[in-house]
C-alpha cells in the first residue's frame, strides 16, 4: 500500500507527457524545426504599419506631369492638374511634423506659372493714357521710366478711381506696382490744384506716410524724378536723428510739395509746430497693414486728426479750401481699417480694390519647407549660401535675403557667417540711424549678395534683384510670411524667385500646415481679413446708481 501512491503518480505524469498535444502535427525526423527570428509582437506591429501605408489614398496619375506639391515621400505628391475641393481633406506632407521623428523631412510648393499674376495681359492699345492721366504726367512717366509701358492690373483698377476723387483702399499682392498707382494721381491732383500762399511753416500738399526709413527713402527715390519733371518738389522726413535733424530737414527752402515721412518724425514736427497739414490735399498710408498695427496706430490717429479728410469727391472741388483725399495701400488687408475710416470719413466714400490673388500663395515662386532641429539650422544655412555662390547659372543671378525674428539673432548669425568667410550685410531695427542709412541701397546695388535682416526689410522695399529668400526663423504670422515671400517674384524681376523656410517649433508647423492646405486647394490663406468691417455700435454707459 505504501508503494501504490508513487506508482499511481508516476503513471499519471507519464500519461500527460505521452498524450498528443493540440495544434501540433507529426513531423518527420528530417524536417527542420521553425526558427523565430522576429518577436511575434514586433511582427504584428510591422504588419499593422504596412497595412496602414497600403490604405493611404494616393493621387492616381493617368500619365506623368508637373507637380503642384512635391514631397520627400512620394505618396504626398499632388499633380498640378489636381485641385482639392474646399471641403475635401487630403493627407499633408507636414501632418506629422510636430513629432521629432519628422526631422529632415521636407516638401515644396512648385511653380504653377512663370509670369507674376500682377502683370495684366493687355492688348497693344492698352496703356496709361486710357486710364485718364494727363499728357504732362504721361510724358514725365515716359521720361523717368521708359520701360514702364503697360499698367498692371492693380494700376488699371486704382488710378481711375483716384482720379474721380474717391477714397481708395487698395490691397494687392506684393510687387504689383502699387507705388505708381497712387503717385501718378497724386501728381496730377497737385498739377490741377493751385498752390496757395505758403504759411510761415512748411505746409505740404501731398503726404505719403510709411512705416520705416528705408521705405521712405525708396518712395522718395521713385517720386523725386517724377516730381522734378513736373516742377514739383519731393522730400523725405525720417526719424531716428533727433529734433535738430528734423528742424534742419524742414528748414530747407523752398518747402516740399510732397513729403514722404515716417509717423514718429512727422508727429514730433507737428507737436513742435514745425509743419502744418492745413493745405494737405492728398494723403497716402503706404503699407497700411503695418501702420494700423499697435506700434503705429496711436501716432497715425493723431496725424489723421490734424488732417482735413474730405467726406466725398464733392469736397475736393473747392480749390481754396483744400481737403485731403485718403489712400490706404497694403499687401495684406489691414485689420481695424473699419474703425479708422469711421473716425475720418464716411465708409460709403471709400472704394475697396482687392486683387484676385490677395492672401494667396504666389503661383510663380517655388516655396520649400524644411523640418529641422534648432541646432541644425546654422549648418543648413551655410550650406545653402555656399551652394548659391558656387551655382553655375546661364542667366542673371540674384541676391539673397535671410530673415530672422529678432535683432540679436541677426547679429549672432552675422558672426557665424564671418567665421565662414561669407560676405554679407546686416539690417535690423536696433541699429543706430547713421549705421542703417544706405544699407539697403547698397544691397540693391549688389555691393553684397547676402542681407541678414529682420522684418524691417519685408515691407514695401523694392527687391527686384532678389532671387532667394531664406526664413531662418519662421515668421510668427501668416501676414509676415506673405510679406517675406513677396520679396521675390516681383514685377520686373529678371530672376526666378525661391523661398526656403526652416521649420523648428510646433507653432511653426501649425502655420506650415495652413499654408500647405491652402496651396493644395489653391485658395487664400485662412484667417486673414479681406473686407472692411464696420465697427460695432458702442453701448451706452449706464450709471450704476440708477
Curated annotation (Swiss-Prot):
A motif (DEAD) lies at residues 286-289. A motif (Nuclear export signal) lies at residues 180-191. Gene3D superfamilies: P-loop containing nucleotide triphosphate hydrolases (3.40.50.300). Keywords: ATP-binding, Helicase, Hydrolase, Mitochondrion, Mitochondrion nucleoid, Mitosome, Nucleotide-binding, Nucleus, Ribosome biogenesis, RNA-binding, rRNA-binding. Plays an essential role in facilitating the proper assembly of the mitochondrial large ribosomal subunit and its helicase activity is essential for this function. May be involved in RNA processing or transport. Has RNA and Mg(2+)-dependent ATPase activity. Belongs to the DEAD box helicase family. This is Probable ATP-dependent RNA helicase DDX28. It comes from Macaca fascicularis.
Amino acid at each position: 500500500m505504501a508503494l501504490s501512491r508513487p506508482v499511481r503518480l508516476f503513471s499519471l505524469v507519464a500519461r500527460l507527457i505521452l498524450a498528443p498535444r493540440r495544434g501540433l502535427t507529426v513531423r518527420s525526423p528530417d524536417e527542420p524545426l521553425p526558427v523565430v527570428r522576429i518577436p511575434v509582437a514586433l511582427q504584428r506591429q510591422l504588419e499593422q504599419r504596412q497595412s496602414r501605408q497600403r490604405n493611404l489614398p494616393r493621387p492616381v496619375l493617368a500619365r506623368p506631369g508637373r507637380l503642384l506639391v512635391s514631397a520627400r515621400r512620394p505618396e504626398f505628391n499632388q499633380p498640378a492638374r489636381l485641385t482639392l475641393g474646399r471641403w475635401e481633406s487630403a493627407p499633408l506632407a507636414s501632418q506629422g511634423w510636430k513629432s521629432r521623428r519628422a526631422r529632415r523631412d521636407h516638401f515644396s510648393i512648385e511653380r504653377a506659372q512663370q509670369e507674376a499674376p500682377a502683370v495684366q495681359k493687355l492688348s497693344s492699345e492698352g496703356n496709361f493714357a486710357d486710364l485718364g492721366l494727363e499728357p504732362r504726367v504721361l510724358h514725365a512717366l515716359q521720361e523717368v521710366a521708359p520701360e514702364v509701358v503697360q499698367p498692371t492690373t492693380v494700376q488699371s483698377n486704382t488710378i481711375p478711381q483716384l482720379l474721380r476723387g474717391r477714397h481708395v483702399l487698395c490691397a494687392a499682392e506684393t510687387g504689383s506696382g502699387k507705388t505708381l498707382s497712387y503717385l501718378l494721381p497724386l501728381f496730377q491732383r497737385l498739377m490741377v490744384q493751385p498752390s496757395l500762399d505758403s504759411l510761415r511753416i512748411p505746409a505740404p500738399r501731398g503726404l505719403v506716410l510709411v512705416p520705416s526709413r528705408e521705405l521712405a527713402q525708396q518712395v522718395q527715390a521713385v517720386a523725386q524724378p517724377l516730381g522734378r519733371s513736373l516742377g514739383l518738389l519731393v522730400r523725405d522726413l525720417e526719424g531716428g536723428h533727433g529734433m535738430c535733424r528734423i528742424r534742419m530737414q524742414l528748414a530747407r527752402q523752398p518747402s516740399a510739395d510732397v513729403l514722404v515721412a515716417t509717423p514718429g518724425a512727422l508727429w514730433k514736427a507737428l507737436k513742435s509746430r514745425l509743419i502744418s497739414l492745413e493745405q494737405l490735399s492728398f494723403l497716402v498710408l503706404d503699407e497700411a497693414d503695418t501702420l494700423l498695427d499697435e506700434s503705429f496706430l496711436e501716432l497715425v490717429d493723431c496725424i489723421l486728426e490734424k488732417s482735413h479728410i474730405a467726406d466725398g469727391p464733392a469736397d475736393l472741388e473747392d480749390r481754396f479750401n483744400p481737403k485731403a483725399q485718403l489712400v490706404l495701400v497694403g499687401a495684406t488687408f489691414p485689420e481695424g481699417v473699419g474703425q479708422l475710416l469711421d473716425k475720418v470719413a464716411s465708409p460709403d466714400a471709400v472704394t475697396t480694390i482687392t486683387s484676385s490673388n490677395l492672401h494667396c500663395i504666389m503661383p510663380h515662386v517655388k516655396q520649400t519647407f524644411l523640418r529641422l532641429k534648432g541646432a541644425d539650422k546654422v549648418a543648413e544655412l551655410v550650406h545653402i549660401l555656399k551652394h548659391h555662390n558656387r551655382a553655375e547659372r546661364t542667366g542673371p543671378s540674384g541676391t539673397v535675403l535671410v530673415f530672422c525674428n529678432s535683432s540679436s539673432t541677426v547679429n549672432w548669425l552675422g558672426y557665424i557667417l564671418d567665421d565662414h568667410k561669407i560676405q554679407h550685410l546686416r539690417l535690423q531695427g536696433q541699429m543706430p540711424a547713421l549705421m542703417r542709412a544706405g544699407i539697403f541701397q547698397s544691397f540693391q546695388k549688389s555691393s553684397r549678395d547676402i542681407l541678414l535682416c529682420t522684418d524691417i526689410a519685408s515691407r514695401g522695399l523694392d527687391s527686384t534683384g532678389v532671387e532667394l529668400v531664406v526664413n531662418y526663423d519662421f515668421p510668427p504670422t501668416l501676414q509676415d510670411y506673405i510679406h517675406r515671400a513677396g520679396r521675390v517674384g516681383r514685377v520686373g524681376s529678371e530672376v526666378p524667385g525661391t523661398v526656403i523656410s526652416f521649420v523648428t517649433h510646433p507653432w511653426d508647423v501649425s502655420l506650415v500646415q495652413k499654408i500647405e492646405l491652402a496651396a493644395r486647394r489653391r485658395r487664400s490663406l485662412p484667417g486673414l481679413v479681406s473686407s472692411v468691417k464696420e465697427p460695432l455700435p458702442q453701448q451706452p454707459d449706464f450709471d450704476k446708481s440708477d
